[in-house]
Curated annotation (Swiss-Prot):
Phosphorylation by PKA could prevent the interaction with PLIN1. One of its GO terms (molecular function) is glycerol channel activity. It comes from Rattus norvegicus. The chain crosses the membrane at residues 21-38, 52-69, 96-116, 152-172, 185-201, 238-259. The gene is Aqp7. Aquaglyceroporins form homotetrameric transmembrane channels, with each monomer independently mediating glycerol and water transport across the plasma membrane along their osmotic gradient. Could also be permeable to urea. Mediates the efflux of glycerol, formed upon triglyceride hydrolysis, to avoid its accumulation in adipocytes and to make it available to other tissues. In the kidney, mediates the reabsorption of glycerol, preventing its loss in urine, again participating to energy homeostasis. It is found in: Cell membrane; Cytoplasmic vesicle membrane; Lipid droplet. InterPro entries: Aquaporin-like (IPR023271), MIP (IPR000425), MIP/Aquaporin (IPR050363). Keywords: Cell membrane, Cytoplasmic vesicle, Lipid droplet, Membrane, Phosphoprotein, Repeat, Transmembrane, Transmembrane helix, Transport. It catalyses: glycerol(in) = glycerol(out); H2O(in) = H2O(out); urea(in) = urea(out). NCBIfam families: MIP. Belongs to the MIP/aquaporin (TC 1.A.8) family. This is Aquaporin-7.
Length: 269
């Protein structure tokens, strides 16, 4: 009986769509634990964290996530990247919900894990209050929020541009016909790319550049006690890190494929 159950489980786990779902789930979980943990250090730890540390946390979190699942699903860990690959015909649309569901669940669980790990520090920092805005806010550990110097639509354009740069450079790093990263170094190079985007272009919006990075942790804070303000803050900013990266990644992909990839002669020609 036990053997039969194990065989059934093994049979299910060998299905391609199941393996891809689990790969996106686990790789996104790894990315987000490192990323959110680094933000928690910056927000809660006074001198124990820094903005550079946040960029390193997310950058090398991406690297580790690709090592975890790159050979199975490609380790997108980003609904905007998945959307772009589907929209540009590089993967089937039927994979889109499988990938995104895995990413969202992994990100949500990572937010819950971060909350449990830093529960004491979060409560101590704000005197037991769960604040979305203000100098003692802690919701920004989990999701991005629009700063005072930015308007909603400037933030939208910012997210479109930065995500476009992300997707353009990912295509360049992985383009075997151009000048790709050395074999085996792609995870490191993409991680460095994320870090560079953060230190050069991340100030305005916190460079969400990923619906899977922003929306699930935001929803976690909503149900964990921060309340409805996580969606209403910043003139209802919440939808921008969901929609703008989809548009930005698509445009960045088109720019690279149209201006660079299409002009590369086939190998052997």
């Amino acid at each position: 009986m036990a053997g039969s159950v194990l065989e059934n489980i093994q049979s299910v786990l060998q299905k391609t769509w199941v393996r891809e779902f689990l790969a996106e789930f686990l790789s996104t979980y790894v990315l987000m634990v490192f990323g959110l943990g680094s933000v928690a250090h910056m927000v809660l730890g006074e001198r124990l964290g820094s903005y550079l540390g946040v960029n390193l946390g997310f950058g090398f979190g991406v690297t580790m996530g690709i090592h975890v699942a790159g050979g199975i699903s490609g380790a997108h860990m980003n609904a905007a990247v998945t959307f772009t690959n589907c929209a540009l015909g590089r993967m089937a649309w039927k994979k889109f919900p499988i990938y995104v569901l895995g990413q969202f669940l992994g990100s949500f669980l990572a937010a819950a894990t971060t909350y449990l790990i830093f529960y004491g520090a979060i409560n101590h920092y704000a005197g037991g209050e769960l604040l979305v805005t203000g100098p003692k806010s802690t919701a920004n550990i989990f999701a991005t929020y629009l700063p005072e110097h930015m308007t909603l639509w400037r933030g939208f354009v910012d997210e479109v541009f930065v995500t476009g740069m992300l997707q353009l450079c990912i295509f360049a790093i992985t383009d075997k016909l151009n000048s790709p990263a050395l074999q085996g170094t792609e995870p490191l190079m993409i991680g460095i790319l994320v870090c560079v985007l953060g230190v050069s272009l991340g100030m305005n919006t916190g460079y969400a550049i990923n619906p899977s990075r922003d929306l699930p942790p935001r929803f976690f804070t909503f149900i964990a006690g921060w309340g409805k303000k996580v969606f209403s803050a910043g003139n209802n900013w919440w939808w921008v890190p969901v929609v703008a990266p989809l548009l930005g990644a698509y445009l960045g992909g088109i720019v690279y494929l149209g201006l660079i990839h299409a002009g590369i002669p086939p190998q052997g020609s």
